[in-house]
Amino acid sequence: FNTAGNMLVADFAAHNILEVNTSTKEVSIYCHEELFNQPNDICINKKGIVFASDPNWQKQTGQIWRIGSDRKAVLLKADMGTTNGICLSPDGKILYVNESVQRRIWAFDVDEKGDISNQRIFAVFNDFGFDGMKCDLRGNLYVTRYGKGTVVIISPQGKLIQEITLKGKDVS
């Protein structure tokens, strides 16, 4: 949900981020960018800056975008693996992005303007892909393991805390 209290949704088929007005249920285009591959997951910081993962599943590549209050998309990072899950640490200073096919999770520092720097590997797995991610208030990262049917919990230091097995295999 954005600072106006409206829901934002990635519309990967039409290269959009959509906004759903929670009062009227009206759907409008929040941001359209022809250079989007297939915007997939999004997260929003306390200032209302939107970060979007943008995979190209066929080519197994991806990008990261930032969308500011002007609703214009700015490419933050190209030439990545298949970007999918994306989330911010509770203080908004670290952006986590996973690459589903390559099974890597990256961490980036985030400045006040929403620019990213200091790209580093946060975690790597040898099997099964990823989908959505979210941080808890302590900064632990919860990562869905698509095809395995688990959610892993990783500490802010990158240590595996727990792996929770679910009933279904295609966890997102």
Locate each region found by the language model.
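Beta-rich, blade/repeat-based domains predominating
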Residues: F1-M7, D11, E33-Q63, L76-I94, ...
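Surface-exposed loop/turn positions within WD40 beta-propeller blades
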Residues: A4, A13-A14, T24, K47, ...
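Short loop/turn segments immediately following the C-termini of beta-strands
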Residues: F12, P55-W57, S100, V110, ...
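A short loop-to-beta-strand structural motif that recurs across blades of beta-propeller domains
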Residues: N16-L18, G62-W65, R104-W106, T150-V152
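Short loop/turn segments that connect beta-strands within beta-propeller blades
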Residues: N21-K25, I67-R71, D109-G114, I154-K159
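Anionic-ligand binding region
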Residues: Y96-M133
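C-terminal closing repeat unit and adjoining cap/tail of repeat-based domains
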Residues: K148-S172
